[in-house]
C-alpha cells in the first residue's frame, strides 16, 4: 500500500487524546491545550498538565509541519530529499511525577514523508519509549521491558533486542559515562517491508506506552517520601536536562530549524538542581541507582 499521511495523522491525533485521557484518569487534573500554527506550514497541539495529584508536569505534544523544501541542514545528510516537498508529524510526551519513587517516562512516535512529481515518495517511521527511575525496583523494570518485548513479538523475534539496544545506545550521557535510565525501545528510519507493516508497528509502540507505564505509576504513587528523596529526584532530573540539551537529536534539530521553542522544551522538568561533586552515601538507595541503570537484559 502507498504511504497514507492522512491516516497516520488521524492515528496520532487520536493517540494524543487517548494518552491525555489515561493520564488524567490517574491524576485527576486536566490538560490545558495550546494550539499553534507554523508560519512556513503546519502547526500542532501542545497539551500540559501541571501540579496535578500525581504528576508535577506532563506534556503531550502533537505536531504536523510541512513545506515545499527541506532545510539545507537536513538535505546535507540525505541528498535524495533535495527538491522534495515534505511532511513531518508526531506525538511526543514526557511525564515528570511528584513522587520520587515514580519514574519519569518519555515516548515518541513520528512519521516523515518527502515527495516530488514523477518519483516514488521517501518515507519512514520512528519512535520508542524509555523509563528514567530515581529509585530502582526490579519488578517495575521487568514489567516495562516485558511490555516492550511483547508488543514487538508479532513483528519478529529480533525486533525487541535490536530496538532495546538502540535505545540503550541512544539514551547515554557520554560526558557522564552513564545511561539516562533503563531504556526501552528506540527505532528510526523504519520503512521495510512496507507501509502497512511499519505503520502497524508504530501504532503498537504508541499504544504500548501506557500499558508499560501506568501500572508502575499506580504501584508507586502512594509511597511515602521525604526531603532526602525529593532532593535526589531533583538532582537526577539534572541528567535529564543535560541529555536533552547536549545529546538529543530531536531537541537540537528542532531548535536549529526554527521549531516552536516552547513545545520543544516542554520535556524539561519544572524543577531541577545541580550539586558540585555530589556523592551518595555508600550502601544507600541513592547509591544503588548507578548500578541499577547499567545496561542489562531485563527479560
Curated annotation (Swiss-Prot):
GO terms for biological process: protoporphyrinogen IX biosynthetic process. Its cofactor is a divalent metal cation. One of its GO terms (cellular component) is cytoplasm. The keyword Oxidoreductase applies. It holds the Pfam family Coprogen_oxidas. Keywords: Cytoplasm, Heme biosynthesis, Metal-binding, Oxidoreductase, Porphyrin biosynthesis. A divalent metal cation binds at residues 96, 106, 145, 175. Transmembrane segments: none annotated. InterPro entries: Coprogen_oxidase_aer (IPR001260), Coprogen_oxidase_aer_sf (IPR036406), Coprogen_oxidase_CS (IPR018375). It catalyses: coproporphyrinogen III + O2 + 2 H(+) = protoporphyrinogen IX + 2 CO2 + 2 H2O. Its EC number is 1.3.3.3. Residues 240-275 are annotated as: Important for dimerization. One of its GO terms (molecular function) is coproporphyrinogen oxidase activity. The record marks 175 as: Important for dimerization. Involved in the heme biosynthesis. Catalyzes the aerobic oxidative decarboxylation of propionate groups of rings A and B of coproporphyrinogen-III to yield the vinyl groups in protoporphyrinogen-IX. Homodimer. This is Oxygen-dependent coproporphyrinogen-III oxidase. It comes from Shigella dysenteriae serotype 1 (strain Sd197). The lineage of its organism: Bacteria, Pseudomonadati, Pseudomonadota, Gammaproteobacteria, Enterobacterales.
Amino acid at each position: 500500500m502507498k504511504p497514507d499521511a492522512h491516516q497516520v495523522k488521524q492515528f496520532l491525533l487520536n493517540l494524543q487524546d487517548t494518552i491525555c485521557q489515561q493520564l488524567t484518569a490517574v491524576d485527576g487534573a486536566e490538560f490545558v491545550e495550546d494550539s499553534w500554527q507554523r508560519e512556513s506550514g503546519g502547526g500542532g497541539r501542545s497539551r500540559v498538565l501541571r501540579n496535578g495529584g500525581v504528576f508535577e508536569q506532563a506534556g503531550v505534544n502533537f505536531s504536523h509541519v510541512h513545506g515545499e523544501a527541506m532545510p539545507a541542514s537536513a538535505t546535507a545528510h540525505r541528498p535524495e530529499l533535495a527538491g522534495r516537498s515534505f511532511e513531518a508529524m508526531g506525538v511526543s510526551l514526557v511525564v515528570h511525577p511528584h513522587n520520587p519513587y515514580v519514574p519519569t517516562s518519555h515516548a515518541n512516535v513520528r512519521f516523515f514523508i518527502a515527495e516530488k512529481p514523477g518519483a516514488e515518495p521517501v518515507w519512514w517511521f520512528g519512535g520508542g519509549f524509555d523509563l528514567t527511575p530515581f529509585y530502582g525496583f526490579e519488578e517495575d523494570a521487568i514489567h516495562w521491558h516485558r511490555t516492550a518485548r511483547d508488543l514487538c513479538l508479532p513483528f519478529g523475534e529480533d525486533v525487541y533486542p535490536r530496538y532495546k539496544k538502540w535505545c540503550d545506545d541512544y539514551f547515554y550521557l557520554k560526558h557522564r559515562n552513564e545511561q539516562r535510565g533503563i531504556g526501552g525501545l528506540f527505532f528510526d528510519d523504519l520503512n521495510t517491508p512496507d507501509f502497512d507493516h511499519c505503520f502497524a508497528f508504530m501504532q503498537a509502540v504508541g499504544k504500548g506506552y501506557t500499558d508499560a507505564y501506568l501500572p508502575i505509576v499506580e504501584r508507586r504513587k502512594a509511597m511515602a517520601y521525604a526531603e532526602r528523596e525529593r532532593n535526589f529526584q531533583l538532582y537526577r532530573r539534572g541528567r535529564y536536562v543535560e541529555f536533552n540539551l547536549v545529546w538529543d537529536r530531536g531537541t537540537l534539530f528542532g531548535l536549529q530549524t526554527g521549531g516552536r521553542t516552547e513545545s520543544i522544551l516542554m520535556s524539561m522538568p519544572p524543577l531541577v538542581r545541580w550539586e558540585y561533586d555530589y556523592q551518595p552515601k555508600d550502601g544507600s538507595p541513592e547509591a544503588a541507582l548507578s548500578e541499577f541503570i547499567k545496561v542489562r537484559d531485563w527479560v
